[in-house]
Amino acid sequence: MLIKQRKGWEISESRVTPEHMFLNRRAFMGTAAGAAALLSTGAARAEDDPSVGLYPAKLNATYADAGRAVTPLEINRAYNNYYEFGTSKQIYDAAEALSIRPWSVVIDGEVEAPITLAIDDLLKKVQLEERIYRHRCVEAWSMVVPWTGFTLKSLVEMAKPKAEAKFVRFETFNKPEVAVGQQPGLFSSYPWPYVEGLTMAEAMNDLSFLVTGAYGKPLPKSMGSPIRLHLPWKYGFKSIKGIVKIS
């Protein structure tokens, strides 16, 4: 019987990296490198935000550890879903077309005190803090992000919800003239603007966080600026971006 002796430089087939994994890694490394080159540009854009003086905010010690290292900003910016601007993960440039000043948030519905607040007026009424949360995507990837914002509960309480209010509805902007994903095409049948919802109990949970900043600076447009939701116990699609209305 012929027995083949493996040479020292040979490895078994089981140890060979599959082609698709190799190609995906190459694509990821290329994306990360490109994002790193754009990082300084993104920082400059953040400095132009009128709320820049509010950051960084004090870290809330209760939410100082998500059990994993914080994901670098250049990776976060380079791998992000924001379907209003297309299906590519690299939507940071497309999102820059969105103007975030002026920007107002309407709070209405089954409340005793409906209000409409410009984003900068809203920021004057809340206490910003930093929380480190894990962000999980239904696509089977996750990140750890140092978010800055305030509890959803504090905003809901401003509007004084009535006893019959059972749910909270969120609505994003609708600007197809700048948001290419809202234009006729792949998502043309989707009923824009995007909406999400929570039970009142979920909305009043202390974990529910309205985000206006990240990494010690105003929130980048590609991450949902000027205001988005983050729910660390739910998949990312529930954390709606670019909020203009809460009912």
Regions found by a protein language model. Give the residues of each.
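Structured, non-membrane catalytic/scaffold regions adjacent to prosthetic-group chemistry
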Residues: D49-S247
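Basic/polar N-terminal segments that are highly enriched at the extreme N-terminus
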Residues: M1-G8, G42-P50
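N-terminal export signals
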Residues: A27-D48
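N-terminal secretory signal peptides
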Residues: M1-L23, G34-A37
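Short, cationic motifs built from Arg/Lys/His that form the positively charged side of catalytic pockets
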Residues: R25-R26, R228
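Short linear motifs in intrinsically disordered/low-complexity regions
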Residues: M21, R25, D49-P50
